[in-house]
Amino acid sequence: MAGLVCFLALVSSSAFAANWPANTLDDLTDIKEAISENHPGPVDPENPKFVDWLNDGYEAAEKLAKKAKTKADYERVLRQYVNGFRDGHLLLYPAKPENLIWPGFLTRSDGEGKTTVSFTSPLSSFLEGSKLVGCDGTKTSDLLEQRVFNVRTNKDIPHEKIVDSPHLFLVAQNDQTKPKTCSFLVNGKLTDLYLDWSAIDPETAESNVRKASGNHRPELGIQKIDGVWFISLPTFNFWGERAVKIQNLITELGDKKEALHKAEFVVFDVRGNDGGNSGWGDQIVAKLWGARTARNLETSKDQTVDWRVSEYNEQALREQAIRSADAGLTDASKFRIRVADDMRKSRINGTDLMLDEARPTGPGLPLQTPSPFQGKVYLLTDWYCASACLDFADNMRNLADVVHIGQPTSADSVYIDNVWKDLPSGEMKFSWSLKVYRNRLCANNIWYDPVIRWTGGEMEDEAVAQWVKTLAN
């Protein structure tokens, strides 16, 4: 009986492995259909290249799907197709957390052709700072292009390569194409190293990538460092039970408002913030600058928006309305119900794109509210700032008393406001945008450059505090 069980297990494993081409093709086709039926891009008259990649990219990915042998191959095919749209809001993520493997070190590229070891385990510490020359006869630039940039980097945003480059040595457990032997310049001496890959859990992997990329993601909160107040907002992704964290912070801002208004230096710190719900940023502005200023900001921007009309999108909006209400975002909930109702009418009329006629569609009155802050106020960004973080940056940069400092932000396409679905294989989830901004302040895949750039080196709290105090001189 034991032998029969082993035999059945082998048959099952083999059959499952043989299904990777089918799984890849099924999910690839489902992604294409989801985009075709629900994303604004295929019916957007201002973006004909979107449809070109929808079809041409699919044909190329379809050929690769037939060759998939492992889950690593499966994921590469899907990511390469999705990444080709150059739309940061088209997203793939695992249906459940999965362990990855790494060789005990991660590298970072400087954007100018040099890749160095920037994070190591204790056993690999001798590699710290060494230059990666190549692996298995392939030079570093080609490795990065094949294994990282083609599958995760928006090539319209050059500095995104720096952020993504640490993923070169973080791979799926069954990746048969992972590097085996790599060459390094260690203290000026060429050294060949056989890579010893070991498991790493997702949370540790994410933490290591951030460290390797030089990203310092603060804890949510308010603190004073060496005379400088930091209002740290590492994410706006607060839903359900987690919403109480940002709600408590906003309450604390109200309690400390007088001290902040009188402070010599205040920094709104969005290092590591890659988005979430922009409503939280709006509430922060209203709490510290007042409801009138928040309203003026809202009406000062051209918010012409077209929504992609579909049954799936309508239902998703109604579900989001429930989640927003549960998080205490009453206005956001009402807004989504209103859009869903309008979408239903448009769907009945056979409309593909629906103009949101209730949104401001032209520049409103200029901001004339006096600043409540007596000292210097800064918005601190890094390369991660995207989505709702960019919405927050839109507002902060339009307040006369705020100076943008730090590193350039990331960038968004004009497509935004996401929903998601499970793919047929159950391996991945796919997320896409519901609407297209016509005249957004930060245009398609255009990032914000700070008024004052970070001087270089690790952007640690104490170093930032010292730097901020020099900016007033």
Model-derived regions: residue spans:
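Low-complexity, Gly/Ser/Thr/Pro-rich intrinsically disordered linker/tail segments
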Residues: 439-473
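Low-complexity, serine/threonine/proline-enriched polar segments
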Residues: 299-353
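N-terminal signal peptide c-region/cleavage motif recognized by signal peptidases
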Residues: 12-14
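Bacterial N-terminal signal peptides that target proteins for export
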Residues: 1-4
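Flexible, low-complexity junctional segments that flank or bridge functional domains
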Residues: 17-317, 322, 376-378, 391, ...
